[in-house]
Amino acid sequence: MLQRLLVLRQHKERRLRQQLAHLRQAYQQREQQLADCRRERQQLCQQLQKLAQWRGNLLPAQASAQRERQHELYQAERQRQKQIGEWVALGQQQLAAIEAQQLLLRCNQREQEKLGMLINHESNRY
């Protein structure tokens, strides 16, 4: 009976480790997406800054086109900023899930140790 419980706990450990690996991989992918999004936002901010520097030196027709371009860049930058906030929130959720998974794994390992000691104790009794 105890041996069967130990085998079940070992299967559970394998499953928990696989899930933990998947969670960590998803977290790393999201971290990369966050870095990419931040880089894109930085590039958009630089483009906006360059457009703002030229603003007073343009003819009215050029200034109108520049305002449209500046508005498009601003909208894209705001979208990236929103996406960054979403990626950060998701990252916090993923970290919490990883920590919870690690806790489950540690608890399962303790249970396996207890079962192992009980099995040893039981076999030593006879």
Predicted regions and their residues:
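Charge-rich amphipathic alpha-helical interaction elements
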Residues: 1-126
